[in-house]
Amino acid sequence: MKLDEIVAWYQKRIGTYDKQEWEKTVEQRILDGFNSVNLKNTKLKTELIDVDLVRGSTFPKAKPKQSLLTVIRLAILRYVLLPLYAQWWVKQTTPNAFGFILVLYLTQLTNWAIYVLHSSRIVPLDYEKPPNGTLLQAEADGDASDKDADKESEEHAALLSALLIPCALSLLISLIHSQIVATNTASGVSGGSSKNKLRRISASYLSDKAATRENRVRRRKKIVRVRQVEADLSQASSNISLPNRRTATSTIEVLPRPVTPLPSPTVTCATVPDPTTPTTPSPSVIRRSTNEETYLTTTAISPLTQPLAAIDACYDLSRKAGGAAPESPKKRNVNWHTPIQIYATYELGEEPCSSRKVAEESAPESVGERLCSVKPDYQTRRNIGEDDGFESLNGKSSSGEDNNHSPLPNAVAVAAPPAPVQTNQLRLRLNTTNGVTASASPTEKKPQSRGNESSTSCAESDECDDADIMSSPASGCNQECTTSATDWLGVTTNSEDCSYTSDLDHSDGGLKHTAFSDEDPGELDITPTTILNPHSSLDRISCTIWDQRDAKKAQLSVLEIASCIIERVDSMGEANDYIYIGVVFSFLLTLIPIFCRLCEVTLGSDAEKASEISYFNMPQLLWEKSSASLFTLLGLAFGDSQWERMVLALGFVQRLCLTLILFIIFAVAERTFKQRFLYAKLFSHLTSSRRARKSNLPHFRLNKVRNIKTWLSVRSYLKKRGPQRSVDIIVSAAFIVTLLLLAFLSVEWLKDSAHLHTHLTLEALIWSITIGIFLLRFMTLGQKIQHKYRSVSVLITEQINLYLQIEQKPKKKDELMVSNSVLKLAADLLKELETPFKLSGLSANPYLFTTIKVVILSALSGVLSEVLGFKLKLHKIKIK
């Protein structure tokens, strides 16, 4: 977008005036990249907790993939052009629901057509004065014409309200639903058709790149840096000239490069060497790919029998392209404290030999760990020389030439062409015994080829089952596995040895994805290991469970404790009170225009007579005026002419249906809040033996650090359980609609007009009251939920229990004091992270609430002081 480019340019421009020389040097170092950092395999310490566990970010929810302006635009289009978006409505709702919405849409079009065809009949007519009439008669005729004009204008406004209000309700429902489903932007096609479409796009993309590659003036060079640790090996390699290395006899067979239609992310697992096969020690190769360079860091594990063979295989790629090797290594990022590093260059169309075939064998006890990674390609977003410092993670070129070359495959041991898959970021680690990265040796060509054949068939059929891979990691990683990144969504693990994380933590201002990406890479980096490892003994605590009258002990995990609360809530009966309240409100709001029309017919145009008539006598007067006929009463309610009756009747039906849908949506939000409150209520019962027994829940005390961690995990999980963002959207929509209605009422009441009690003002008032009742319910439940999860009283009670245990068991004083200190820290952390309940982003500020209370009470005391004759004072109003 042009505006985006202008803002980015100006931001970069003004940033140059604040920079000093040291900052420019640091930024240049960042852009160059820190490629000399050694990477080692490690294991995350999942037994520790983060602040996200208390805040609730450990169990994240889906986030919208579209901006607010995009959602509003799509909501308008989906309502105005509803038949064209039939597939979307059917997918997001049901066919029956879409049919019902389509009928309402067609009735609205019919209503507008009838109104447009007959709208000329309700235009006020011009009354001419009689030529020979008196002045008094002319004034009387003028008054009559003014009254008729006012009557016609009121009828015109009533007809317009019957047309515009259903349209506004339909647009509001479309906007709410479009914002709810903004997290799901996938098209309505099936998985197979999307993959076929991706293959077609990949083929066209490859042809375009081939055309641009032919016309390219300068070729990019890749640098292969081979690092050797052993001093004798480095000395031997440095004493041999490059021509001798090229003519040396190589015993490593270079596999032919597979032809791939498009460099796509693949999940690859290196082949496991057979422990029974005699192996030859060889250097371990770790490949690190950046945007400008590709480094192959080779660390010698033991003295090599044929060190020159591996070097010859690496330099064979330069001989293949007809290019010469550099005479001296590149001097950037040189560390003189490290062994001698040998460099080799190769052109773009070539592939380093170490990426084709890696000569590495590990000891039998180190066999079993596999590293599978997917590295996506991103669109070029910056110009030449610009980078964000993350090129080593996301594979994005810092020189802006990603579209001009084909990046090297990321596979370590690739012997068969992988099928194109959807772009995503995923790293899967499958551990069995120990943790080293292994790959096939040169002597194990047959097992590797068998594994590649099986992986190729798996990739082509797209029927690889994730459950099989996860259940048998040792056998699953004996072959190269290529699968779609979206297939890993929803994978649950039962052990600590099987987990997956993302390569890059994506934020809101992160990099843009390619056009082939369907899933957000940031969503794969947020898997809660606390819930997904229920069988780990470290995450289980001792709980008390009541079997009728007997108390029994059991070791339960976070997931099992939370599931007990969820099952208990699900077993409770759902109250339908607010559903019925919404139905009543729908009929009430629909009958308001009819009620106002009947009141106008009954009272007539005489204002003095209308002020004298009591509203309790109106039903009797209306029945007398209709001559005790129901059809006459309906005629008075829906107009005189046939087309007016049609417009008002269709508007009545539309308003009833749409209002009912809207209040059902509000009832869904109320039920979700009630469910959250029940979760919070039962969560507070866990540490109380009496309440836990009454609620049939497990019971445990916070006398151990492990118990405190489990308690915090259950609290965080239950707070994120169920619909979150969608319900917040509904509540925010109700709040904003109420604000708009109150603003309209304020403007109407500020007018000095006799038309203060029109049906529009009355309808806006009733709408504000009905939606305000639901908002009051939301605020009440939200405050109760916050109070239950605050749990300060629970923590204080557990501290008292710890002191009681110290008195009873002095030998365990140190352990109990540690738990007491952790409880105090947990209480302080909960107070620090506590936020009040927010309604549409606006929190219930206690200071603002107290200020308003003081102002209202002060005004009330002033009025009462004047009425009663003595002064009233306000006492003990404190701001908490």
Swiss-Prot record:
Residue ranges of every copy of the PHTF domain listed in the record: 4-185
One cellular-component annotation, GO: membrane
Localization per record: Membrane
Family annotation (InterPro entries): PHTF1/2 (IPR039775), PHTF1/2_N (IPR021980)
GO MF, one annotated term: channel activity
Bias (Low complexity): 265-274
Region (Disordered): 256-286, 357-412, 434-464
Residues the record lists as Phosphothreonine modifications: 527
Glycosylation sites: 132, 239, 431, 452
Keywords of the record: Glycoprotein, Membrane, Phosphoprotein, Transmembrane, Transmembrane helix
GO aspect biological process, one term: transmembrane transport
Entry annotated with the keyword Phosphoprotein: yes
Major localization class: membrane
Membrane topology per record: Multi-pass membrane protein
Residues with Phosphoserine modification: 517
Sequence intervals crossing the membrane: 68-88, 97-117, 156-176, 575-595, 646-666, 727-747, 756-776, 848-868
Domain of life: Eukaryota
Feature: compositional bias, Polar residues: 394-407, 449-459
Name of the protein this chain belongs to: Protein phtf
Species whose genome carries this gene: Drosophila melanogaster
